[in-house]
A protein has these predicted regions:
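A structural signal for short, well-ordered beta-strand segments and their strand-loop junctions
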Residues: 30-37, 66-70, 79-82, 126-127
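Residues that flank catalytic or metal-binding motifs in active/ligand-binding sites
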Residues: 34, 63, 76, 143-147
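Conserved double-stranded beta-helix
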Residues: 88-188
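Short N-terminal helix-initiation segments at or just after the protein's N-terminus
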Residues: 2-15, 66-69, 90-97, 143-146
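Hydrophobic/aromatic-lined pockets within catalytic cores
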Residues: 23-27, 72, 130
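Short, solvent-exposed loop/turn segments at secondary-structure junctions
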Residues: 38-45, 57, 73-74, 87-88, ...
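Catalytic core of non-heme Fe(II) oxygenases with the double-stranded beta-helix
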Residues: 48-118
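Signature of the catalytic double-stranded beta-helix
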Residues: 1-41, 45, 52-53, 58-63
Length: 188
C-alpha cells in the first residue's frame, strides 16, 4: 500500500471516482485523507476483522464520509455491514446503558437490523462513518479487496484528525485560496 500511496496522482484519481456524488453530499471545497487505506479480507480469516463501531465514537468528525471502493464483487460476509440511520438513532439513545459491553455483545444486539451491503466491482459506496458498521469473518470462498478514504468539507469542524496531519484540501475555490493566504497590512 505504501507504493500505491506513493503514486503521484492516486489521490486525484480516487477523488475523481466519487466526485459526482461527493460534491452534492459534502460540498465543493473538500479535504481528503492523506493516505488511502487498503483492506484485504481472506476467506475464514479472523485476523482482519473490524468489530462494530462508528468512527465518531473514537473522535472522528461527524462531518466526514467514507468513499469505499471494492476491487471485487462484495456481498454477504465478503462485504461490510451498516446499521441504518433509524436503528443507529435508537442505539445512540441507549448507548450509555450499554457502556462496558463488548463489541461482540453490541453486534449481537443489533445483528437483526444491520444491512449487509452488496457493492459490485466497478461501483463506489459513500457512507456516513457516524453510522455503526464493521465486518465479520468472510465465509465466502473469495478474498475481499477494497480501498477506503475519508472526505469532508474543508471548513467544517475537525475531530481528532486535523487538516495538514490527516487531511489535505483537494478542491479549493479561488476566493478560499485568496482568503487563506491573505495577510492584513500592518498598522502602526
Amino acid at each position: 500500500i505504501n507504493s500505491i500511496n506513493a503514486e503521484v496522482d492516486l489521490r486525484l484519481r480516487y477523488f475523481e471516482l466519487a466526485k459526482p456524488w461527493l460534491e452534492p453530499l459534502v460540498g465543493n471545497e473538500l479535504a481528503m485523507q492523506l493516505r488511502i487505506n487498503l483492506s484485504i479480507q481472506m476467506p475464514r480469516d479472523d485476523s482482519s476483522l473490524l468489530p462494530v463501531h462508528a468512527d465518531t465514537w473514537s473522535g472522528d468528525s461527524p462531518y466526514e464520509v467514507v468513499v469505499w471502493v471494492p476491487m471485487v464483487d462484495c456481498f454477504k460476509t465478503k462485504s461490510m455491514y451498516l446499521l441504518p440511520p433509524e436503528a443507529a438513532r435508537r442505539l445512540r439513545s441507549e448507548f450509555a446503558r450499554r457502556a462496558g459491553s463488548s463489541s461482540e455483545d453490541l453486534f449481537q444486539a443489533i445483528e437483526s437490523e444491520v444491512v449487509w451491503l452488496e457493492v459490485p466491482y466497478g461501483q463506489v459506496l459513500i457512507f456516513d462513518q457516524g453510522l455503526p458498521h464493521g465486518n465479520r469473518v468472510n465465509e465466502e470462498p473469495e478474498t475481499r479487496w477494497s480501498m477506503n478514504c475519508r472526505f469532508k468539507g474543508v471548513f467544517t469542524p475537525y475531530g481528532d484528525k486535523k487538516i495538514g496531519e490527516f487531511f489535505e484540501p483537494i478542491t479549493l475555490r479561488a476566493a478560499s485560496r485568496n482568503g487563506m493566504s491573505y495577510q492584513y497590512p500592518e498598522v502602526s
